[in-house]
A protein has these predicted regions:
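Glycoside hydrolase catalytic-domain context in secreted enzymes
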Residues: 1-168
């Protein structure tokens, strides 16, 4: 029998229970993968993450929350989220304010669903067009990549969090 993602995470009464969460999280730690959670409507997506987070915090003696990650190469990659041009396309504008705005929208959409870590464009230089990740970069110009990297980090963090300048 084949089940869709919603059928797999809800019990027979249509509830997302602690028992269901325990199947995802052994001993309150580890890496969780919910399959095609990203295909779920925003409310369902958020409900699942919130229930899992509650379980993890309550089941470990230090109350340490889990980190949820999400792809944000050109907007948050999830059902109903905003999609923007690719990183290399955004870089071609040389518009750092635009890039900051793009990633502030992605951050808002991710936070609204409980996602705490964003996988974003590659800040390495694309020196060889044969590299499979070239389209996920801001290009080959060090000055441009640095400016776009700072703008994307500022957008994601809202300018309110310190970041390690050695890695931007």
């Amino acid at each position: 029998t084949s089940y869709n993602a919603q059928e797999k995470v809800y019990d027979a009464q249509g509830k997302f229970t602690d028992e269901v969460v325990k199947n995802f999280v052994k001993d309150g730690v580890g890496i969780m993968r919910f399959g095609r959670l990203l295909d779920q409507p925003p409310f369902t997506h958020t409900e699942i993450l919130n229930a899992t987070q509650k379980y993890v915090i309550e089941s470990n003696r230090h109350g340490i929350p889990t980190l949820y990650y999400g792809e944000a190469l050109h907007g948050y990659m999830a059902e109903g989220a905003t999609v923007f041009p690719s990183a290399i396309g955004l870089a071609s504008t040389w518009d750092t304010e635009l890039v900051e705005e793009v990633y502030s929208v992605a951050a808002l959409e991710m936070r609204a669903r409980g996602v705490t870590v964003a996988f974003t464009p590659v800040l390495g230089l694309a020196r060889d067009a044969r590299w499979g990740r070239t389209g996920e970069t801001y290009g080959e110009d060090p000055f441009l990549v640095a400016r776009m990297g700072v703008a994307s980090v500022n957008g994601l963090q809202g300018g309110s969090y310190p970041y390690d300048q050695n890695h931007v």
